[in-house]
Amino acid sequence: MRTKTQKKSQEKTNLNLSGYNRMMKLITQTTDLEIALATLRNSDFVTIDTEFIRETTFWPQLCLIQLASPDTTVLIDPISQDIDLKPFFDLMVNKKIVKVFHAARQDIETIYHLGGVIPSPLFDTQIAGSICGFGDSISYDQIVQRCTGYQLDKSSRFTDWSFRPLSEKQLLYALADVTYLRDVYLLLKKQLEKNKRTHWMDDEIAVLLEPKTYDMPENEAWKKVKGKIKKPRELAVLQKIAAWRERKARQYNIPRRHIIKDECLIEIAIQQPKDEADLKRLRSLNKNWDKFSIAHTLIKAVHEGLEVDLATLPALPKHNPLNETSSAVIDLLKVLLKLVANENGIAPKIIATSNDLEKIANGCIKKNIPAMNGWRYEIFGQKAEQMLKGKIGFYLSNGKINTKQL
């Protein structure tokens, strides 16, 4: 059942939607953009969403920008030949205005690639929602429904946003992505402040504000490759060929997997082909993979990996099997984690991952473990330390597990 506040919020938003027909003009010229954005500069916050396509490209192609303040909505056509987006990018770095997104990473990546700026100050309603008890990675339509009671029409989600003209249905869909976001933001902001949890967002927001998040250095591309290697020399080769793939994907503006798949990189790192003939013998490589005639440059990258001084490599991750004691400790940590999560009304995996628990159980309590840092340490990590030292125990009362100081 919706509350009176939710009903009022929906009525207010539906009233705004009823006036969309006169507000759905798509801005295609710089002068109109400057006029429209001037009305947003006096706002405390602006909600933002973008529509883009990137199925066949490395870089996202920005197709539409949606903005809303408490009393204004703006639709921008970034594809127009008559528009300069500088006024928009200037707004993104205006320190007086909070930029509100839902699941901001891809939107910011698109903005950063095109304009070289990262919106700041920043508020992400997906992150805030996870802290306010809405679960991990809640979708936009779900959080709108839970906060306002309104069910969004998502049927236009996968339409071709690069095609012009955009339909009225597409524009209505696009505007809904920022108008309802206003109500969600205000509700979550109030709840965070009430529970004194605003600072809990700091670590996640810091990642979103870091340029490295959107422009990964070539020499770190290997960290994103899925697959296991066991030997230092394999790691050296993987580093070089993953960097090679990153360069080629950017050069040709196509997805990394269209250059070569992760499983192929792993096989090459292990087999270390010396020439193109060796390369053709690999089972994971499709015979028609080399459509850009770049096999010789891949072999060169392999040779570079074979010449790397192994002493300069980072340590390979260790996959030590858990002993009986460590497994038991992990079970106890899971019990503690569930208790803490229930007490704070948030999902357990937002506080600590299975990997965090395994490291803690093995005696690693370094601050670079997310669960042992920041607000997570305040509510869970500190108790985990005390439990490992025998200072916290569990007891059963009225069918419920509780903790007590020992």
Curated annotation (Swiss-Prot):
GO cellular component terms given for this protein: cytoplasm
Annotated localization: Cytoplasm
Entry keyword annotation includes Cell wall biogenesis/degradation: no
GO molecular function terms attached to this record: 3'-5' exonuclease activity; nucleic acid binding; nucleotide binding; ribonuclease D activity
Primary location class: cytoplasm
Gene Ontology annotations of biological process type: tRNA 3'-end processing
Known EC number: 3.1.13.5
Catalytic activity field: Exonucleolytic cleavage that removes extra residues from the 3'-terminus of tRNA to produce 5'-mononucleotides
Domain HRDC: 231-312
InterPro entries linked: 3'-5'_exonuclease_dom, HRDC-like_sf, HRDC_dom, HRDC_dom_sf, RNase_D, RNase_D-like, RNaseH-like_sf, RNaseH_sf
Cofactor(s) it depends on: a divalent metal cation
Keywords, comma-separated and alphabetical: Cytoplasm, Exonuclease, Hydrolase, Nuclease, tRNA processing
Entries under PANTHER family matching the protein: RIBONUCLEASE D
Family per record: Belongs to the RNase D family.
Name of the protein in its database record: Ribonuclease D
Gene name of the encoded protein: rnd
